[in-house]
Every structure is written in C-alpha cells, then in structure tokens.
Amino acid sequence: MKPRHKKLAIIASSVTALGVASVLVLNAFQSNLVFFFSPTQVANNEAPVGKSFRIGGLVEEGSVKRQADGVTVNFLVTDTAKVIPVVYTGILPDLFKEGKGVVAQGKLASDGIFRADEVLAKHDENYMPPEAAGALDQADKARKTVMQ
C-alpha cells in the first residue's frame, strides 16, 4: 500500500470506530435516561405510561396508608394543583413524612397509579429537589392565576 492509501485507511477506520463508539454511548444514555414529571404533568397525560420516570412533589397530609404486609405503602403525591396515587413496596427512607418533599422513580400503570421502585425523601428543612421545587412553584402560579 502506498503511504497515501495507508493514511486514508487509518482515517476511515478512525471515523468508523468513532461512529460505533458514539452509537454505543448514545444507546446507553437513552436506556438509562429517566425524566422528571410533576403530578400536574402526569395528570395531563404528559408522562409515558409503562416507562420509567420520576415524579416529585409533596406527600399529601393524611394519605399514607400501610398495607397488612408491612412493606407496601400507598400515598398521594401533590404539587398543590393535582394529586397522583403512588404504591411502593419496600422500606421508606427515615425522612419520609406527610407534607414533606418526595421524589419517586417508577412506572405509571394504565390505571393511573404510579408504581414506585424507589422513593427518595427530602433530607433537611431547607432542601427540595430542584425539579420538585420548580414544579411546585409552577403549579402554585397556575393555581393563583386561575383563582384571579
């Protein structure tokens, strides 16, 4: 092979390898990407049914109900505008309380119940996940606009 052909072969191989690597990385990102939705967005059918995503807001007061098995918990997540029922089987975080911030990851069933695989609770009095805080602010502004 001439030096010029070798150089072209190396460039072509490099471009092909870079393309394959890019496809693999994008595929990995796509399969691990988890979107965040507020209860209002879920209630407005903006969230995918049967696909994993996160929902965040406040645990509605008086909504936490433990099942007889001791590990399944039903509760409601709200952004002060809409409410979504959540079912979680597992041990809840110590800081999980009614009226406090929560982010749950799982799938929305066709019956409208969010089946959580993981529940994350607010960890101090001043912290709320940015997505949940933004969703609460947006829902509160919308509610105030409607009331005027």
UniProtKB/Swiss-Prot annotation:
Q: Which UniProt keywords apply?
A: Cell inner membrane, Cell membrane, Cytochrome c-type biogenesis, Heme, Iron, Membrane, Metal-binding, Signal-anchor, Transmembrane, Transmembrane helix
Q: Its domain of life?
A: Bacteria
Q: Which SUPFAM superfamilies match?
A: Heme chaperone CcmE
Q: What ranges does the Cytoplasmic topological domain annotation cover?
A: 1-7
Keyword Metal-binding on entry: yes
* UniProt topology in membrane: Single-pass type II membrane protein
Q: Where mainly located?
A: membrane
Annotated Pfam families: CcmE (PF03100)
**Location of this chain's protein in the cell:** Cell inner membrane
What is one cellular component GO term in this UniProt entry?
Answer: plasma membrane
**Which residues participate in heme binding?**
H123, Y127
Q: Which InterPro entries match?
A: CcmE, CcmE-like_sf, NA-bd_OB-fold
Periplasmic domain ranges by topology: 29-148
Q: Name one GO molecular function term.
A: metal ion binding
Keyword Ubl conjugation in record: no
Residues spanning the membrane: 8-28
User: What processes in GO biological process is this protein linked to?
Assistant: cytochrome complex assembly
| HAMAP family xrefs | CcmE (MF_01959)
Family under the similarity heading: Belongs to the CcmE/CycJ family.
Q: Which NCBIfam families match?
A: PRK13254.1-1, PRK13254.1-3, PRK13254.1-5
Q: What does this protein do?
A: Heme chaperone required for the biogenesis of c-type cytochromes. Transiently binds heme delivered by CcmC and transfers the heme to apo-cytochromes in a process facilitated by CcmF and CcmH.
What name has this protein been given in UniProt? Answer: Cytochrome c-type biogenesis protein CcmE
Please tell me the species this chain comes from.
Nitrosospira multiformis (strain ATCC 25196 / NCIMB 11849 / C 71)
The primary gene name is ccmE
